[in-house]
């Protein structure tokens, strides 16, 4: 297994996952010594900086221990790892990966719960919502289309502008921290509308995700979202 240099996921996270897989499948047994960082860099054709970042993640996760002069040793078997996508949102994920992202805001408007039914979302009927439609691009290439419904009972008087959303993470603007989400993911072929928005062919598979996002300590979602994403980005979520 090699790192994918065309992927949006940082190389060090890919390398972290690869090593975790090798530990889980027994290629690197518990107590075994890992190759040196220079050997890893040569094997995977990555820089030593990338390897050091992956090593730091592995050490912080308690998966390996490293002593100067004696190398690195596998000290625990990871139960599961995930990389590429978190509950913080795609903008923050990619900013943390030092990837420049462009937000193209298509619409911001008040909506009612029944308006979300066309997007396959079931929202509490008595609440009011702020709807956001946007496209995300990397290097001028669209990769994600989102239809977001924000429950205004969490954000009384909320006003958002396209200009603010183009340059700042939505969660930063809302001043919220999410600690959990419920997602239903399915593979689809794009509609004509999605082909146009994402500039893709009709036979290009997409992942369609229905998501409910929760604030820490809250029982009801503050955000309901239907988003479509190219598998090159989201496909790196493996398991927990």
Swiss-Prot record:
Residue intervals of the HTH gntR-type domain: 9-77
PANTHER family to which the protein is assigned, alphabetical: MANNOSYL-D-GLYCERATE TRANSPORT/METABOLISM SYSTEM REPRESSOR MNGR-RELATED, MANNOSYL-D-GLYCERATE TRANSPORT_METABOLISM SYSTEM REPRESSOR MNGR-RELATED
Consequence of gene disruption: Null mutant gains the ability to efficiently use exogenous aminoimidazole riboside (AIRs) as a source of thiamine.
Main function: Represses the expression of the STM4065-STM4067 operon.
UniProt keyword annotation of DNA-binding present: yes
Organism the protein comes from: Salmonella typhimurium (strain LT2 / SGSC1412 / ATCC 700720)
Pfam families named in the record: GntR (PF00392), UTRA (PF07702)
Protein's name according to its UniProt entry: HTH-type transcriptional repressor STM4068
One annotated GO molecular function: DNA binding
CDD domains according to UniProt: WHTH_GntR
InterPro entries xref list: Bact_HTH_transcr_reg, Chorismate_lyase_/UTRA_dom_sf, Tscrpt_reg_HTH_GntR, UTRA, WH-like_DNA-bd_sf, WH_DNA-bd_sf
Protein keywords: DNA-binding, Repressor, Transcription, Transcription regulation
Gene Ontology biological process terms, A to Z: negative regulation of DNA-templated transcription
DNA-binding region (UniProt annotation): 37-56
Organism taxonomic ancestry: Bacteria, Pseudomonadati, Pseudomonadota, Gammaproteobacteria, Enterobacterales
DNA-binding recorded as keyword: yes
